[in-house]
Each structure stands twice: as structure tokens, then as C-alpha cells.
């Protein structure tokens, strides 16, 4: 009970109080009046303490002692009266409202409400603590279940590891057998290779000896002149001068007979003789001289034939014989007979041969190409051959034949098979029917086109070759890379990649300085980046935008522009570049720029022609620069002219891959930096840690049957569900426990300061130290202290507030609080203390008032708990003993921590008063400003004058300004006044140096003698308003927010089955949406279809 006997004197009540039956005025529960109440209570308790009426009065929440014989009490909503009569005391629990005035009754109800709130808070706190303990018990039980599940899974894992070892052993044995088989295969291959090599050499020897030709005596080379050999090769003829050059005074030269023109040689010889001899033309002596000269130059003529000419003549004769044989076969239709025999031989069994022979006879009789029957004998089963014969005889009944064949084959496959074979048999039957349809159409086409037999065979072979070749080219092969990774690709893809790589290598090898190669431009990968200091070029790599550091230097937010879209984005991080004064800035990629194509890193970095993708000076139109670039020590040097705003632009090679980034121009040389190695290290691919486990499970799965796998999956799925339920329950309990603790702490904070401290101390003793103190209570005093030190060392390591020895003693021996608790209890709030200071109370007067309030609280506590004051007269000695034990505990805790090598001190949180001499704070909408001064005691008065000038008398909105001046014990706090921050300036008189650091906050440091410093720090913070992102719809052109996908669908033109024309949803239907039966109208086709299917009565 909060004994409110001292709070119910109506004479001191303010005049502006509400009626008793109205709402209780705020603040009445804080009023108290101690004048004479204590003496009156002592007198009445001494006179009526044993009377039941007095005990009934003391059971009330609030008691008002009117005089020595009359008292009024309030319990819940009832007002009772205590009276002293001559024959005794009486207590009436109801009906005493008439004895109080309206104001006194309001006081009493306010005090009663306070007591009820306290009782309800204590009950709620106890309930919450009980619920928290139950939740903690359930959490412990759930964790035990989780540990059991973990143990079961551990057993499963051990079993899996054992199975893995067995599989590994079996795999090793299989590999050994495979190596043995490979050796045997190698031996056989070696023998086969030697045999093939022998036949190759034999063939080459035969060909070599066949090409040799016979020689005779007349084909021997003469000692003087040339040897003429017969030949029909088409070569140009020789002149007389050529013959002289080759055959005069030479040995062993050979001339072909096709090069010798006798008439031409005689004519040219006579002309040469007339010219050199100087005689007249036509002199007979010249003819004789020329004939003798030619006989001398060409003395021998060889008339032998070579093997090639003999072989050619024999081949021509063979071809003539083959042509005559073919004409004979065509005349007597012997090709059909050959095909007949060939088809009969292709039959795989006797039944098929018996069924194919009639088909061949029918084909010969009906003049059907025998090649078709040959193909049918190979691809069709015996059961479908009757349908093949029917199709040969009656080609016009193809649909009926296919229908009957389909029914017959499916029924036969169903009734003749069972189990898994049933599906295979039915599928095979359907394939046979499809082949029958294709074969029948092919027969009709061949009959109509009258294609020769040879052409038919070639057509069949070509079709088979193309189909098999395409299938082989598209087949998948497994490529094993040197790092152990495997990749499945098709043969066509592999060949295409190899050719592309080879072409790229050839292209790079042909790159010559001076000839600029053509390459793709990457304008679709760059954007404009604007910062506080200027603008530049950005480019996309993976899922980020990158640019140079000096483009956005000093900017936390940058603007990215691309065409008509611009977004303001926060910088993600800054990457340092090796041996470079500039940096690389990474900006996150937003959803508005997902269409920007990313760049890929170059595979090879070397001196070559590079392309710089950038913007023109207007930062709208895109431009590219291309030229020879030299790479040296990670930097790129080029000689082409760049412009302002090209910083951050990417360098790409002839394949469009990223090489580096442009930094700027110095004179006639432009400089960039290579980024390939930097970006590779910044975005390392995460290595998979479960590849081996997956491979082991795959190998294990190949050894397990399908049924076993399904059983194991069901079992594992059940265990996973159990784990999920346990985890969900654990999370739920932890969440409930957290909510309970938060709600409990919030409830405790609502209590008054004095009761809160008592309740917290009691809860701490009951919850945290109960189990520990029960063990310590049985120890001797010295061992108790050592045990307490161990407990407090662990609490100090965890950062918890050290519990005093007073608390421990209270939990061990005392049942009630001592007076020492009330001697340090806080009785005044900051508002009450400031009010008393403003009213002119001195510190001694305030201390006296606080001591009286503490004494009154102590007396109320004694009355509520029915404790005599003589029961606890040694409270002062207990307080001194507690302080002594505190010091001993601190000393032992620090010594224990030092022995462990751990720090014994913790960082103390400094308040505004502890931080600086002056602290000014101004809060306004959109921006706020703070000023902080730290100085030496010699200049406190000078800064105090600045503080008084800075704080103006104009009032501001509550909570918008704070001014604090703290010098030793003197502290001044002024709120909600206009503050001029410019009045606070550093006092530099006598300072050695004055330094100013103009960063985000302007800091001025003045250094005096003995390195003493005064620091004045002023900071203005402006709220950054992000620019609203706007995006124009490409379909309708509007900028208002709406679903762009739905808008695009509504504007897409499609064929409408109802209207019979192409239109979009926006254009609407050209035909009214009415039911053809009942003429009911609808808003869309879906409603009309639903009506026609379900609700239309006439349909």
C-alpha cells in the first residue's frame, strides 16, 4: 500500500480542481502534506492499533486522518469512515462520501488510482515473469529435441561415409579392370595397325612399279643435243632460240614431242641464218645448214609409252564395256532381278524372307521401284508387311490402309505384351504406322517422277547420309577441362567455337600498326555519371556501374543518366588502384538500367588498337575514339585527342571486351589504367564446397534401385519436416520470450522511480542470484566473499553492472529493505529540481527537502509492512559494511582479471555535460546544426560570455533547440530558445598555432603552452532528398505510375476470333459482345464464354 495519509489535506488543494465524479486532474497523485500528520498517526496507532476497526481502516488504499477521532479511507471505489465513540471504535466501509468535500474526494481518488496502478503493474510483472520462465522451459525442451535430431543425423552421416568408402573401394577395383582392358585393347590395336601399315606399303609398291615404263636403246640420252620423248601433254611449242639454248653443247636435256614444231623451227632457223650470214633470202645452202643443225640439236627421238597413258586407254575401254552391259540390263530389266535378289538377301529371318518374296513379285509386275521394297524389308516388322503389299496393289486407299494398320498394330502390341514392355511395344507400333505413311508417299512420288534406279539408290544413300550426319553433329559430347570441370556441348558447337577461336587468332596475327581494324562499338554499355564536382562516363560490368574516382569525388550520391532516364543513387564503395592516384568507384545497378549491356573482360592485354567509348561535350550524343595504344606497367597510353567529360570511359579491344578505363589527358598524351586484373580479384567466383558430396551421392545413387531411392526420399522428407517443425517451434519460443522480456521491461519502466528500484532489486535477487546464493549461503564468510568474486568476475566480463554486496546480503539474510536503500533514493525529477532552483531554493534547502521526503518514504514503508523502527537501527553500520565489501570485491575482481590477462576497465558512456564545456543543438526541418566547445579552465569565462551572447531570448517550438554549458559543478541547460552559432568562436589569444579542418564539420584547433588545446567544432547537416525516379512508358508514352506490362498487353494487336480482325484491347471489339442465342450483352469475351457454357438457357 502506498500510504497516502500525507497526501489528503484539502486545505492546501489548488482551486482549479475537477469535481469528484469527473475525471481525475493530472498531478494530484504527486501531492503530499507532512505538517502534523506523522504525530497524529502515531497517536492514533498507539490508541487504536489493536482494534479491528483500525485494521479495517489500514486495509484501505488511501487514508485521510481528519482528527484524533475521525479518519476516512478509500478502497477501490468505496469510501469508508473510522469513528471513535465513547464505547469503542467503529468502521463503516461505505457511504462516507458526504464527510468529504468535492476537492478532498478528488485527492483521495487520485491517490487510490496510483495505488491500484502499482498493484496492477506488480501483478502484470509477476505474470510476465512466470510466462517467460515457462517459455524458457519449453525452449530448453525444444533444444533437447533438436540435439536428439542432430544425433540421429550424425549417425546417418557416419553410415553414409562408410558407404562412401565401400563405393570408393569398388570404384578403384573397376578402374584397375578398366586399365587392364585398355592394355589388352592397345595390344590388339597395335597388331591391327601393323597389318594396315603392311597393306599400305604393299599398295604403294604396286603403284610405284606400275608407273615405271620400259626403255629401249633408242631412249638413251645422247652426248650432244636433247632427247625428244613422245607425249600428248598440252604445253607451248619451243622457238629456234629456245632449242639452241637447251640443246646446243649440252647433255641430258629432255624435250617433249608436243613442244617440237619442225616447220616453225626450219623457218626461224633460215631467218636467223639470213640475218647473220648476210646472204639473200631463200638460199638453198641455208636450208641444208638448218636441217643439219636441227639433226645435231635433236639427234634421238624416244617412241615409248608411259604407264599413265596405258592405264587411261584401258580405263576407257572398260567404261565402254560397262556402258554396253548397262544397256543390256536396261533392255532385259536385269536391274530389277538384281534388286530382287538383294532384297531377298536382306531379310533377317525366314518368316520375313517368305513375306518379302511376294512383295517383290508384285513390285515387278506393277512396275514399282524395287528399291522401295528393299527399304520396306529392312525397316518394317513382319506383322505390318501385309499392309505394305495392300498399299502396293491399291495405292488409292492410303487413309483407310493407315487407319486399319494403326488399329491392328496397337491392339496386337497391347494383347501380346505386359509390364514395362507394353509401353515399348505400343510405341514401336505407332512408329511403324508412321513409317508406313512416309514409305507409301515416297512410293507414289517415285512412280510419278520415273526416277532411274541409280538415282533412287543415290537419293536414298544421300538422305540417309544427311540425316545420320546431322544427328551425329548435334550429338552431345563431354569435354573434360584441365581443372577437372566437365562440360557437355554438341559437336557443332565445339567446331564452331574452335573455328571462331582460330579466326580470332588469325585476325590478331594480321593486326599491323597503321591499319586500323574494324570492331564493334559498345555504346549500349555506357551511361553518364554526374557528381558534385562534374560529370563523366560510366560503364556496366556484371551488376554494377563503374567510373573514375575523380568524377564523383566528395559525392555520396550521384546521378546516372541514360537517354531519357535519370536516377539518383548512393555510391556503393571505392576501390583503390595499384600505383595510381585515382580510384575506381562502384555504383549499384538499379532496375531502371537493367537494359544496359555488361562488358566482359579482355582475354589478352597487349599493345594493339583500342576503342574508347564516350560522349561528346554535350553529354548526349555518343562518340568513339580509336587508335594504337601502348600498355606499360598497367597503364594505357594513346595519342588520339580526347575531350572534357571522357573521364571514366572504357577502353575496349577489337572484340568489344573491356581492357581499361580512361583517366584524363596530359598535353598530347591521354592516359588510362588497365582494369582486367583489378576486376578479376574484386569479383572472385565463389568456390563450390559440395561438389565432392554431390559426386559421391550421384555415384551412390547409381548403385541403388529406384524403389530404395523412393523409400529413402520419404524417410529423409519426414526427418526434414521434423527438423523444420522443431526449428519453427524454437524460433517461435525465442520470439515469444523476447516479446515477453520487452513487454516486461516496458511495464517496469512505467512504475515510479522509488518503487521501480525496489522491484528491480527484488527481481534480480529472485531470478539471477537465487541458485547461486543458495550454494554460497552454506559457505563460511571468507569463502562466501571469494565465491561472490567469481560470480562478479564473469558478470564484469560480460559487461553487466556489478551487483553490490548489499544486494547479496539482502538476498541471503534480510527479509525487508533497510533504511540505507531510502537514504540514496531519488526523490525529485529534473523538472522538479529545475523548478526549485528557479524559485530560489539554495542547495542546502533542496537537500533538506529531499531528506525529509526520504524519511517520510521510510516511515510509510514501515507502516505498510508493519515493521517497527527499532527492528533496523543498524542500517548505517550495514551501509558502511556494504561499502567496505564493495571495495574488496572491486579489488579482487580487478586482480582476477589481471591474472587472466584481460582488461579490467570498461568504456564509460559520457553524457552531453561530460563531453564539452558548451554544446549547442538547433533542430529545424530539413537541416540541423551543432556546435561543441572543449577548452582549458583558463578560458572558461571567455567562452561563457560567448554562450550568453549566442543564446537569444526569442522562444522557439518545443524540442527544436538545446544549449548546455557545463563547467565543473555549474551546469546550465536552456531549451527552446533562438541560438546564434556564429557567436561561438575560438579564443586564440596566446595561442601558438591555430589549425582549421574544413571537412563535413568545420573544426578549429588552437594549441597553447604545454600542448594544451581548445577545440571548437561546428557541423551543419542537411537532409538529402532523393530525386523521384520517373520512367516513361514505351507503349502509351505516359509518365504516371502504372503497370507497364499490362499496358503493353492491352495495346498489343492480336487476331480476334469473335470479330475476325486484328485489334488491341484499347481499340475494342468491332462486333457487339452479345450471346447469339439469348442476345444478352457482356463486357468481355470471358464473361460471354462463361455464360455460353454454364448459364445460357437456350444453348
Curated annotation (Swiss-Prot):
Enzyme Commission designation: 3.4.21.-
Alphabetized Pfam families for the sequence: Astro_VPg (PF19416)
GO molecular function: 5'-3' RNA polymerase activity; serine-type peptidase activity
Top-rank EC class of the record's enzyme: hydrolase
GO CC annotations, alphabetized: host cell membrane; membrane
Keyword Transmembrane: yes
PTM comment, free text: Cleaved by the viral and host proteases. The protease is probably autocatalytically cleaved.
Biological process according to GO: proteolysis; viral translational frameshifting
Annotated InterPro entries: Astro_VPg (IPR045836), Peptidase_S1_PA (IPR009003), Peptidase_S1_PA_chymotrypsin (IPR043504)
O-(5'-phospho-RNA)-tyrosine modifications at: 833
Active site positions, chain numbering: 550 (charge relay system), 582 (charge relay system), 647 (charge relay system)
Substrates-to-products reaction catalysed: RNA(n) + a ribonucleoside 5'-triphosphate = RNA(n+1) + diphosphate
Keywords on record: Covalent protein-RNA linkage, Host membrane, Hydrolase, Membrane, Phosphoprotein, Protease, Serine protease, Transmembrane, Transmembrane helix, Viral RNA replication
Site annotation Cleavage: residues: 168-169, 508-509, 795-796, 915-916
Positions of transmembrane segments: 195-215, 329-348, 353-373, 397-417, 426-446, 450-470
Coiled-coil intervals: none
Family, as annotated: Belongs to the astroviridae polyprotein 1A family.
Protein name, as recorded: Non-structural polyprotein 1A
